[in-house]
Swiss-Prot record:
The gene is rps601. This is Small ribosomal subunit protein eS6A. The modification Phosphoserine is found at residues 235-236. Belongs to the eukaryotic ribosomal protein eS6 family. InterPro entries: Ribosomal_eS6, Ribosomal_eS6-like, Ribosomal_eS6_CS. PROSITE patterns: RIBOSOMAL_S6E (PS00578). GO terms for cellular component: cytosol; cytosolic small ribosomal subunit. The keyword Electron transport does not apply.
Length: 239
């Protein structure tokens, strides 16, 4: 069985193949989400604590959280379920998924390091992979650099270097567009929107008042006409 071990604190992961079933015995009959000590896996994992995050069986079917079985089942999946990406709105599909209990039929078991042990694992805990992109939202940039509301966020955007594909061209830097950035221009747009809204509301009120007056006038005219017709009919009956 292969162990795909990830270390979220450093952003690294490593695939380790283990042939001895006795070293893997500690994972058997455990469920996804459970924490397992890594002492019996090998001396290099002494003191480590792993969390089972998933896995695939020998045919490639992924483990599904919540299915308390050590084998494959066919489930009707919809949007929002793991292991399924709908192609159309409202689409559902019956797909084969592996239960969340670890067994011998797994080819790869995914683990995350919850607690680091005594010694480093080469290529996993001794290496740090920096994030490729920095924060993009204005409030997150402020939190990241501990800025106040008076500081200009645009000066603290993390730029990344882009190497052109064509030879001979110099590398250049790119910065993301800051989202939810409050500037005088955005405030002016907001004031303009509210002014348009107020103007439209006033116009609607005036039109409603005019329409009410017109309706009252038409109702009065119709009433007068009915009274004239009624009087004419009464006078003709007297004759």
């Amino acid at each position: 069985m292969k162990l795909n071990i990830s270390y979220p604190a450093n952003g690294t992961q490593k695939l380790i193949e283990i042939d001895d079933d006795r070293r893997l015995r500690v994972f058997m009959e455990k469920r996804m989400g459970q924490e397992v000590p890594g002492d019996s896996v090998g001396p290099e994992f002494a003191g480590y604590v792993f969390k089972i995050t998933g896995g695939n069986d020998k045919q490639g079917f992924p483990m599904f959280q919540g299915v308390l079985l050590p084998h494959r089942v066919r489930l009707l999946l919809r949007a929002g379920h793991p292991c399924y990406r709908p192609r159309r709105d409202g689409e559902r599909k019956r797909k084969s998924v592996r239960g969340c209990i670890v067994g011998q039929d797994l080819a790869v078991l995914a683990l995350a390091i919850i607690k680091q042990g005594e010694q480093d694992i080469p290529g996993l805990t001794d290496v740090t992979v920096p994030k490729r992109l920095g924060p993009k939202r204005a409030s997150k940039i402020r939190r990241f650099f501990n800025l106040s509301k008076e500081d200009d966020v645009r000066q603290f955007v993390i730029r990344r270097e882009v190497v052109p594909k064509k030879e001979g061209k110099k590398p250049y830097t790119k910065a993301p567009k800051i989202q939810r950035l409050v500037t005088p221009r955005t405030l002016q747009h907001k004031r303009h929107r509210f002014a348009l809204k107020r103007r439209q509301a006033e116009k609607n009120r005036e039109e409603a008042a005019e329409f009410a007056q017109l309706m009252a006038k038409r109702v009065a005219e119709a009433k007068q006409k009915r009274e004239v017709v009624k009087a004419r009919r009464a006078s003709s009956l007297k004759k």
